[in-house]
Amino acid sequence: SLETGRYLIHNGNNIVSRNLAEDRSLNPKRIVLLEPTDKIQLTWIIEKSGDEYILNNRGAPTAHIEDHVFALLIHQEGATKWSIEAVPRHGRNAYIIKGSDGKGWVAPDKAGEQIIYRTLIVGPSEPPTFPLNQVFQIIKLE
C-alpha cells in the first residue's frame, strides 16, 4: 500500500494533473491528461485514510462529479476517498484508482482531455489485467 507523501501520477508517458492554466472561479477544476512537461507543480499529495486515500493536486482534494474527476477548491468535505489497488502485472508502480461504487479513473484518448470516471474493464485472467488507459503509474517523490 502507499504511504502518505508526495507523488507523481502518470498514464503511460502523460502526466495526470490539474491544468496549468485555469479560470479564477472557485468551481471544481478538471483533472486532465497532460503531455510530459516540467513536473514541479504537478505533484500530488496522497493522504492515507484507513484503507482509502485522499488524492490532493495543487492543494485541492479530488472527487468524481458525475462521470469525470475534479479537484475541489471549496466544499472539500465532498472529496472522494479513493481505493488504490496495485496491478503488479502492469509494472512496479502500476495501480488502478477506484471510488466506493467500484467505478474508477480512465485516461482519455488524448492529452488535454479530462480524466473519466466510469465502470472499469477487467480482463478475465488471474491475476486480472486492465486496459492501459485504466492503469496509472504512481511514483513516490523523495
Curated annotation (Swiss-Prot):
InterPro entries: Inhibitor_I66. Inactive at pH 2.0, activity is restored after 10 minutes incubation at pH 8.0. It holds the Pfam family Inhibitor_I66. Gene3D superfamilies: 2.80.10.50. Keywords: Acetylation, Protease inhibitor, Serine protease inhibitor. GO terms for molecular function: serine-type endopeptidase inhibitor activity. The modification N-acetylserine is found at S1. The keyword Acetylation applies. The keyword Acetylation applies. Serine protease inhibitor. Active against beta-trypsin and alpha-chymotrypsin with dissociation constants of 0.35 nM and 40 nM respectively. Inhibits factor XIa, but not other enzymes involved in coagulation and fibrinolysis. Does not inhibit subtilisin, lysyl endopeptidase, arginyl endopeptidase or papain. This is Serine protease inhibitor. The lineage of its organism: Eukaryota, Fungi, Dikarya, Basidiomycota, Agaricomycotina.
